[in-house]
Amino acid sequence: DPAVPPALRPSPVRRPLPPELPREERCLEPQEPACPACGGDLKPLGEDVSEQLELIKSAFKVIKIRRKKKACARCDVIVQVPAPSRPIERGIAGPGLLARLADAVCDYVMSMGKVHVDDTPVDVLQPGKGKPKTGPLWVYVRDDRNAGSTQPPAVWFAYSPDRKGAHPQTHLAGFSGLLQADAYAGFNPLYEEGHIREVGCMAHARRKIHDIHVRHPSPTTTEALRRIGELYAIEADIRGRPAEERQQVREARSRPILVGLESWVREKLTTLSRQADTAKAFNYLMNHWRALCYYAGDGWAEIDNNIAENALRVISLGRKNYLFFGSDSGGDRAALMYTLIGSCKLNGVEPEAYLRHVLAIIADHPINKIKELLPWNLTIPAE
């Protein structure tokens, strides 16, 4: 009844998980040696029991979690280990069940030969420490619609406890092709191996000049932004055209502008103080010039990495609804859900309807046909 407040409505009764599935019990005992409120002795009070469905090496099993409760004999305070995090609040699906879907998205994203990469920091709680740490969420995007591709776009997120280059190097260990990203030094070992080609982000370089122009506009920054603006005007003209046509147009129209921009910037650097902000922005441009110009000779590449930056907007939205991740494992769970939700959004699929349908059928779906459940492959029945 819509008139009945949610808090007063009876909760639906969930059917128990099939008894024939193998089960594993995990007993979580409170770690407190004494009452945290008054220091009194703790005595057993009972336990809360829950079950969650998990996929272990392509076979389902039920994880029965017993969370022991203890009560203080002096002040009646109750202590108990918090319930383990789940991908879906109050859901029975464990993270491993949905992880196969996220893995399938990852395989798809990495299979094309071009990927957009970026990262954004998130706050993560550290048990026993007074303040949270920062752990990045990495985003990997496959989206070639600007080059006329009809292949579905997709996004894969990965969490890491720090921003060391070893993490994206691991993520991209089996990848070969174009890597469009900013000039993060952690990617350099990948470029040195030879099977990954660096493609730069003109928007990143332009932003450095634009920020200076906003604070201290000058004829030099005005001219630099005008020249870069001409490059973006060409991109607007050819957006959605086939890669071969984009390459031809860029060679004919963009390449001469890039050649002129390089000569002009190098000349300006001879007249600017090395400590000047404009000189620093121009040096960034020249230091990464080869990667920034690569797109002009390849119709599949983009002028910038805005595709990845746009995919990170969902994280910015999330920050308005939560303050931090509760743990590193919580970061992994968030990356999994962002992968599925982000890929739904890129393909015009309503995320809540998709997840509701997938969770209803995934337990009975053949694991070797998991790709059938990807957002762009699945037909969601009308409700």
Protein language model features and the residues they cover:
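Short, conserved catalytic/metal-binding motifs centered on acidic residues
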Residues: 35, 72, 101-103, 118-120, ...
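Acidic/histidine-rich catalytic cores and adjacent linkers
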Residues: 176-177, 181-186, 221-383
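Beta-sheet entry/capping signal
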Residues: 34-35, 41, 69, 112-115, ...
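Gly/Pro-rich turn-and-neighbor structural signature
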Residues: 2, 14, 31-32, 36, ...
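Short, flexible loop/hinge motifs at secondary-structure junctions
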Residues: 1-89, 116-117, 147-149
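Short helix/loop capping segments that flank catalytic or ligand/cofactor-binding pockets
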Residues: 44-46, 80-83, 124-126, 148-150, ...
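Structured secondary-structure scaffolds
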Residues: 87, 92-103
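Conserved beta-strand -> loop -> alpha-helix junction used to position metal-binding or nucleic-acid-contacting
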Residues: 114, 183, 192-226
